[in-house]
Amino acid sequence: MRMTTEEAFVKVLQRHGIDTAFGIIGSAFMPISDLFPRAGIRFFDCAHEGSGGMMADGFTRASGRMAMIIAQNGPGVTNFVTAVKTAYWNHTPMLVVTPQAANRTIGQGGFQEVEQMALFRDMVCWQEELRDPARIAEVLDRVIRKARRASAPAQINLPRDMFTKIIDIELPQGVDLPRPAPDAQALDRAAALLSSARFPVILNGAGVVLAEAIPDTVALAERLEAPVCTGYQHNDAFPGSHPLFAGPLGYNGSKAAMQLMSQADVVLCLGTRLNPFSTLPGYGIDYWPKAAAVIQVDINPDRIGLTRPVTLGIAADAGAVARGILARLGAQAGDQDRAERAARIATTKSRWAQELASMDHEEDDPGTSWNERARAAKPGWMSPRMAWRAITAALPPEAILSSDIGNNCAIGNAYPSFAAGRKYLAPGLFGPCGYGLPAIIGAKIACPETPVVGFAGDGAFGISVTELTAIGRADWPAITMVVFRNYQWGAEKRNSTLWYDDNFVGTELDLQVSYAGIAQACGLQGVVARTMEELTEALRKALADQAAGKTTLIEALINQELGEPFRRDAMTKPVVVAGIDPADMRPQPR
């Protein structure tokens, strides 16, 4: 069949159902974008390519459908770097299209030229550069299938002089492979370990959500009467209202989950690479059960046993493993101490729920007083925990939430729960600031009938604030965004209070800036909430307005209390050896 290279490219996109693209328009790919309207492909032109990549991440994580990111070669493509690495650690399949400088000029250090294959080599599961125009459909088809198979970004690099060529090809048929099935002997061994367990605990990770295996883990947990914890930032991997749900592990997570995990004699880790933040101590509890038998299930064999010793590893689909274990459990599996275990789970959860409901303020470490001073400086102001309680009072159960990284968002780890998967979008282990706003925009584009709420601290929000200039247009859906406003980079300031004697370098934000005012200047609704009552009411109204097509940014004014530091394990108090003298500073030579 005769066609142009750009027609072949778009036809492959259509065959794979990729109908949504994010980026900023550029001359290097206009032959492709010219065909988007006729092909039924929506192009969302963001304010910054990095945010566009995070929109694509949010789009796919909320819906399970792959999106494409595309930008001008050189500086447009380099702006994708943070977003692509974020998607890689979020296990998000993503088509990364990188137009390249023309073959006839590349290597001359020309306009908008950079080594784009080298740039993404450690950030994608697969990458190919098109060498022959006649192979464009074959290469694109393979890149898309690789992204889906590995659940990760994959890159196609397109020299711009490959377009507007007439080729005669057959479109590739391709082959879809099933997800890896578990080894029968490994399932037998896992079932035997769990059948004899006195206190089994299940830890669900992102792989459970990606495999749509939550119902399978519910059935397995109920058979074993096993409490279920979720990994850090994967709070939607088990129904929040289920009696066996213990909550999230990790930083500012559920104390109940940590206490129950510490008692386990067998731990089944489903769909998780056991990222370090899911096993670090919290609330003073070193909860990972070092004497327990640990069964780790991950679709990627390279991640099994990578961060923690395991007794048994199974490289397979989490749902297939859960179903296989359930079918092989012994007749008395879960019966040992079942009633006592159920009572202990309920009591532990109840005790933590009461404690969490009464936690208004953050504690100071011995010898420090920042939080005490922060409360005294702004009496009557909401604390971060008060703000989170006010927020959860207004959240509908079906809402999709996004969270940025930072101290105030992390404090919220213990608060919202979810009835289904693909409802909680956090920045993941790459940890980029500026994720909350673009991710929730992408989620709303993917799920226009579902209410969405994004969260960010005011430092992180400043990185993506320019997207307010993009989202007010008629073809963009309405969203709701909550910004915690305490005028500081909280995580870094917390480190300064604990290890650097309140020497605040680069932690203070501009008191003159109003994010609500910026939203209004962009034609959106911007409101300020100063109390818990105002915040709950503002969020309820914003969600109603969202349903009516209006975007609202809520600037929630809070005091400057600071929660737990992210990295107690990585920080130490500095020592003075040679000392630093300002008199040693010399002028630079001219």
Swiss-Prot record:
Question: What's the superkingdom here?
Answer: Bacteria
Any GO BP annotation:
L-valine biosynthetic process
InterPro entries xrefs:
DHS-like_NAD/FAD-binding_dom, Sulphoacetald_Actrfrase, THDP-binding, Thiamin_PyroP_enz_cen_dom, Thiamin_PyroP_enz_TPP-bd_dom, TPP-bd_CS, TPP_enz, TPP_enzyme_TPP-bd
Pathway the protein takes part in? Organosulfur degradation; taurine degradation via aerobic pathway; acetyl phosphate and sulfite from taurine: step 2/2
- Per its UniProt record, what CDD domains does this chain match? TPP_PYR_POX_like (cd07035)
What's the Enzyme Commission number for this chain?
Answer: 2.3.3.15
Its cofactor is: Mg(2+); thiamine diphosphate
Question: Pfam families, per this entry?
Answer: TPP_enzyme_C (PF02775), TPP_enzyme_M (PF00205), TPP_enzyme_N (PF02776)
Q: Which UniProt keywords apply?
A: Acyltransferase, Cytoplasm, Magnesium, Metal-binding, Thiamine pyrophosphate, Transferase
The Gene Ontology CC terms held by the record are:
acetolactate synthase complex
Going by the record, the broad EC class of this enzyme is: transferase
Q: What induces it?
A: Induced by taurine via TauR.
Subcellular location, principal? cytoplasm
Q: Where in the cell is it found?
A: Cytoplasm
**Which Gene Ontology MF annotations are present?**
acetolactate synthase activity; flavin adenine dinucleotide binding; magnesium ion binding; sulfoacetaldehyde acetyltransferase activity; thiamine pyrophosphate binding
Under catalytic activity, the entry for this protein gives: acetyl phosphate + sulfite + H(+) = sulfoacetaldehyde + phosphate
Concerning its family, UniProt says: Belongs to the TPP enzyme family.
**Any idea what this protein is called?**
Sulfoacetaldehyde acetyltransferase
Q: Organism, per UniProt?
A: Rhodobacter capsulatus (strain ATCC BAA-309 / NBRC 16581 / SB1003)
Q: Which gene encodes it?
A: xsc
